[in-house]
Amino acid sequence: MQKRSVFFISDGTGITAESVGHLLAHFPTVSFKHIRLPFTDSEQKVQEALLKIAETEKADGARPIVVMTLVNTDLRDMLKQSNAVHLDVFGSFVDPLAEELQEQPSRTSGIAHSVLGNSYYERIDAINFTLNHDDGMTDFGLSEAQVILVGVSRCGKTPTSLYLAMQFGIKAANYPLIPEDLERGSLPEALKKYPEKLYGLSINPERLHSVRSERRPDSHYASLDNCRREIRLAEDLMHREGISWIDSTSRSIEELSTIILQKIRVNSNH
């Protein structure tokens, strides 16, 4: 497998640069090493970045990829002196817009987040909420959740919840359907008050067996028979409770989140 190093260089937090970096997922046969250099906002820091890029090129034997979000044109020009593949987010998008609109863009670092006003801080609040309500950790404040993902252990609830919080500012809780719930054939008591917030995830039993075996090999928990049984009982339970659900086996977190987000928006309009 081809291996390449990718630098995410920003004069702010680097969130925008890393968002662009999600496009790397379209090259599944390449292994990318991520190197983050946030707050690169001076000539000295750019010089340090240039040194790291040169060292990485020498070690890898291949040009690094540099995703940059620098608003200062002088610093951008300095960075482009490196022997790398440069993806200049500001130059590629903002500069052509400035020419078309006949307006000078703001050169203030972090403006991409500050213009969002309260929504930026709402996203941070959503992340904290999601971390505090991961895997049924607590039902305190569960009424604030915009969605509660349910499903058997290791079906993708946690990464999907975090993606919803980080990318969309959604307060996403997740709650496991444990063997006791499945045997009883009913939802955990804490969830019964919020049927409209529930959304289920399921998974192919063979895939679940593989994932669980990495964590607890040769256990009843990871056995294929148990995985098949848990999935069957969980899907039966979600069907009885009228919970919409989706199979996560062959879907990316981005795709799962988009589908769930559509449900949240439909519910919020009712």
UniProtKB/Swiss-Prot annotation:
Catalytic activity, as annotated: [pyruvate, water dikinase] + ADP = [pyruvate, water dikinase]-phosphate + AMP + H(+); [pyruvate, water dikinase]-phosphate + phosphate + H(+) = [pyruvate, water dikinase] + diphosphate
Q: Nucleotide-binding among the record's keywords?
A: yes
Q: What keywords would UniProt list here?
A: Kinase, Nucleotide-binding, Serine/threonine-protein kinase, Transferase
InterPro entries from the UniProt entry: Kinase-pyrophosphorylase, PSRP
Binding-site positions, ADP: 151-158
Pfam families cross-referenced by the UniProt entry: Kinase-PPPase (PF03618)
GO molecular function terms here? ADP binding; ATP binding; phosphotransferase activity, phosphate group as acceptor; protein serine/threonine kinase activity
Question: What HAMAP family does the record point to?
Answer: PSRP (MF_01062)
Supply the name of the protein. Answer: Putative phosphoenolpyruvate synthase regulatory protein
Supply the source organism for this entry. Answer: Methylobacillus flagellatus (strain ATCC 51484 / DSM 6875 / VKM B-1610 / KT)
